[in-house]
C-alpha cells in the first residue's frame, strides 16, 4: 500500500468535485508533504483535459523530486475527467496539447476517495472536507476508471 508520508504530493482538485485545498488539508492530516495544490474546472478545459499550466507544474515537480517519489491526488467529480487526469500523469496527455504530450511520467495517481488514501486521512478532516462530495460522486466508477490507467501506466506500483 502507498504511504503518503513517504511521497511528495501533487494535488489536482476539481471545482465541481473535491477542491485542491480540501485535498491538501486531508493529505497534511495524513502526514504528507504537499508540494503543489490546484483546483481545476475540468468542464472548462478543452475536452476535459488537464490544464496546460498544471501539466507543466506536474512535469517540473516530477523532474525535481524524481517520479518514483511523487504521488498525484485527484478530486474529480466524474469518472471520465478523473481518468483523463490519471492518464495524463501516467502515460501522457491524450489530447496532445500540453507539456505532457507524449511524455510518460508513470506517476502514482489516486483519487482522494479511494480506500488506500482515505484510510490514511484523519477521519474528522475527511468528514469535513470530502464526505459531502463523496455522497454525490460515483466513487466506484471513479475508482474503476483511475485504477485502469494506474494499472496500465504507473511505473511505481
Swiss-Prot record:
| Keywords from the named record | Oxidoreductase, Selenocysteine
Matching InterPro entries: GRDA
MF terms from GO for this chain are:
betaine reductase activity; glycine reductase activity; sarcosine reductase activity
Query: Its Enzyme Commission number?
Result: 1.21.4.2, 1.21.4.3, 1.21.4.4
- What subunit structure does UniProt give? Monomer. Component of the glycine, sarcosine and betaine reductase complexes, together with components B and C.
Family stated for the protein in its record: Belongs to the GrdA family.
The record describes the protein's role as: In the first step of glycine, betaine and sarcosine reductases, the substrate is bound to component PB via a Schiff base intermediate. Then the PB-activated substrate is nucleophilically attacked by the selenol anion of component PA to transform it to a carboxymethylated selenoether and the respective amine. By action of component PC, acetyl phosphate is formed, leaving component PA in its oxidized state. Finally component PA becomes reduced by the thioredoxin system to start a new catalytic cycle of reductive deamination.
Q: What is this protein called?
A: Glycine/sarcosine/betaine reductase complex component A
User: What gene is behind this protein?
Assistant: grdA
Amino acid at each position: 500500500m502507498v504511504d503518503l508520508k513517504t511521497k511528495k504530493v501533487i494535488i489536482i482538485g476539481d471545482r465541481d468535485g473535491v477542491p485542491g485545498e480540501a485535498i491538501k488539508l486531508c493529505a497534511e492530516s495524513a502526514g504528507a508533504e504537499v508540494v503543489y495544490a490546484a483546483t481545476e474546472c475540468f468542464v472548462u478545459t478543452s475536452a476535459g483535459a488537464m490544464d496546460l499550466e498544471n501539466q507543466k507544474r506536474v512535469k517540473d515537480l516530477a523532474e525535481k523530486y524524481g517520479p518514483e517519489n511523487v504521488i498525484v491526488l485527484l478530486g474529480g467529480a466524474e469518472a471520465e475527467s478523473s481518468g483523463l487526469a490519471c492518464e495524463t500523469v501516467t502515460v501522457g496527455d491524450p489530447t496532445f496539447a500540453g507539456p505532457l504530450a507524449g511524455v510518460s511520467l508513470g506517476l502514482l495517481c489516486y483519487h482522494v476517495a479511494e480506500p488506500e488514501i482515505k484510510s490514511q486521512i484523519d477521519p474528522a478532516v475527511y468528514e469535513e472536507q470530502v464526505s459531502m462530495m463523496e455522497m454525490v460522486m460515483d466513487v466506484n466508477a471513479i475508482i474503476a476508471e483511475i485504477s485502469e490507467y494506474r494499472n496500465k501506466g504507473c511505473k511505481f506500483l
